[in-house]
Design a protein with these regions (language model features):
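Short, well-structured N-terminal submotif of metal-dependent ribonuclease cores
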Residues: 1-40, 50-60, 125, 132
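Active-site neighborhoods of divalent-metal-dependent phosphate/nucleic-acid chemistry enzymes
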Residues: 68-113, 117
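Short loop->beta-strand "edge-of-pocket" segments that line small-molecule binding or catalytic clefts
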Residues: 4, 37-39, 66-71, 113
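Acidic, PIN/NYN-like endoribonuclease modules and their adjacent C-terminal/linker elements
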Residues: 3, 30, 104-134
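Active-site-proximal, substrate-binding regions of enzyme catalytic domains
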Residues: 53-75
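Short, flexible loop segments at the rims of nucleotide/cofactor-binding pockets, characterized by
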Residues: 15-18, 47, 90-94
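Histidine- and aromatic-rich ligand-binding microenvironments
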Residues: 6-7, 41, 96-97, 118-119
């Protein structure tokens, strides 16, 4: 089973019962969990944490038995930095690398697929990355 790194937007859709995306995100998570190992990293964890009052509540929503936690590889951090340079040279205005660069780079260097509902940036900066998206 090829692991799948889950983007925070999918998890937040489910956690917040997003009226537009929660049905798609819930179904995609369920389908992907049946056929793959679901992965999260510290950036995904941090982004999702804003919707929870305590770490215990977050850990209950993202149980380690369902979401394997993995640190960000240094190779992914390097690649994220290179993507950020490309972004800035292309006119991007952010002053530091975006979380999506770290998430996409992690999936890319680890050989994982990525489950997201916001595929455009990932496809731009990680064209070989296998993406599960609407």
């Amino acid at each position: 089973m090829t692991p799948v790194l889950v983007d925070s937007n999918v998890l937040l859709d489910v956690a917040t019962a997003d009226p537009v995306w929660s049905a798609w995100s819930s179904a995609a998570l369920e389908r992907t969990a049946d056929e793959s190992i679901l992965m999260i990293n510290p950036l995904v964890y941090a982004e999702v944490s804003v919707g929870f009052p305590t770490i215990e509540a977050l850990d209950e929503a993202l149980p380690a038995s369902l979401y394997r936690r993995e640190d960000l590889p240094y190779e992914a951090a390097f690649l994220a930095g290179k993507c950020f340079v490309r972004y800035r040279r292309g006119g991007g205005s952010k002053a530091s690398p975006l979380p999506d660069f770290y998430i996409g780079a992690h999936a890319a260097v680890a050989g994982y697929r990525l489950l997201t509902r916001d595929a455009a940036r990932y496809r731009t900066y990680f064209p070989k990355l296998l993406i599960i998206a609407p």
